[in-house]
Amino acid sequence: MATASPTRTKMRIRKGDTVQVIAGKDKGKTGEVLRTLPWENRVVVQGVNLRTRHVKPAQEGESGRIVTEEASLHASNVMVYSTDKKVASRVEIVVDKDGNKKRKLKKTGELLD
């Protein structure tokens, strides 16, 4: 049985954006996007969806440790957050006079890049 090959999703959320979680156990939290995973349609957000991992000692004499790190969230569970207006909004793509594409928040009209 053949499995479906993963497809790259065009994401409107980028690294460095401030986002708010809109679903799940961390609903309402905000943070900066550290990494996007377009092949999985997921994002890693700073301080959100934390997981603890036990790391074995790499060398003899070194002790093992417990590491807390961010796990990825599905991109549909986050919205871009305006820090000025304190509101989460969807993103639309607008084309300016020169033909360049820009991202704009639908609720506030704020340009992202």
UniProtKB/Swiss-Prot annotation:
Pfam families: KOW (PF00467), ribosomal_L24 (PF17136). It comes from the Bacteria. One of its GO terms (molecular function) is structural constituent of ribosome. Signal peptide: none annotated. GO terms for biological process: translation. Keywords: Ribonucleoprotein, Ribosomal protein, RNA-binding, rRNA-binding. One of two assembly initiator proteins, it binds directly to the 5'-end of the 23S rRNA, where it nucleates assembly of the 50S subunit. NCBIfam families: rplX_bact. Belongs to the universal ribosomal protein uL24 family. This is Large ribosomal subunit protein uL24. It comes from Synechococcus sp. (strain RCC307). The lineage of its organism: Bacteria, Bacillati, Cyanobacteriota, Cyanophyceae, Synechococcales. The gene is rplX.
